[in-house]
Amino acid sequence: MKRSILLLALLLCTTLSFAQKATYKVAQRDTCDLFMDVYEPVAIPGDTLDRPTILFVFGGGFVMGQRDDPWVLPWFKLLNENGYRVVSVDYRLGLKGVRMKFDLFHLLQSADLTKKAVDMGVEDVFASVRYLCDHAEELGVDPDNIVISGSSAGAMISLSSELEACNRTVRAEILPAGFHFAGVMSFAGAIMSDSGKPAYKRSPCPQLLIHGTADEAVQYEKMGFGRRGMFGSSYLVNNVLKPAGYTYQIYRYVGHTHDMAANMMANWPEEKRFLEEAVMGGNKLVIDCTIDDPTMPVLGFASVTLDDIY
């Protein structure tokens, strides 16, 4: 009941009028132009915190979605009202119009296609990051204080962006030397890999992972064959982040499915704590929390599966 009351209060207090929003063209691709929307924060009297810019990557299975999806705007407004600048970015939809099958005979092909779509998304997000860095002064952005966040496919791109930034891949060469994200907030995300278990060549930034334990769209654990696979939040914590002593906070919602990809408003207390303590405060506290909360809202697309999307 408490969480439902909190969500209702946030929605009632959050209108969709923004103090200031500006749109910028970031890059030109063969198939489309890429833009970003910048939502300016509300000035908080007496606030001395060095708040990061929140870069958001939308979801939609790499076949749909847009940077200003109506359902996510209340969350942007909530972040603005708490002093955070929000930058919502475009990326090309790498699986739009692609026929995907997930039976045994097509699993490897589908994994390769998904990895290609993630890579394309990372390339486009890095173009936006470069734009922010090159125009940091005029946009009021600190290049060393950017938290990347994403929902579903956007969370997959966000986690992969941090991995590639740490490993300085070819796609990451567009980033300024020494660039690093200040944090990652992943809502039902995973890392696609064609080279086995993900590994970081330098310590990653703090990561907030929110995932439903029964998610059938983006794996909570792992799905794959051989060195190809989708490595979900639980697998990444248990096999990558925890053994290496990296900083993470994971909230495992028992019985929830893919609805956790869009429950940012209900998870605001966890996000606020992560941003204030792990990102701004530098607290290396690790949180691994399994939550069975009947008051957590279940959204309309909770039962979505891969077959539903493709």
Question: What is each stretch, according to the model?
Answer:
Residues R67-V89, K96-V98:
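Short amphipathic alpha-helix adjacent to the substrate-entry channel of hydrolases
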Residues D103-E138:
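Alpha/beta-hydrolase active-site loop
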Residues A19-L49:
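N-terminal cap/lid segment of alpha/beta-hydrolase-fold proteins
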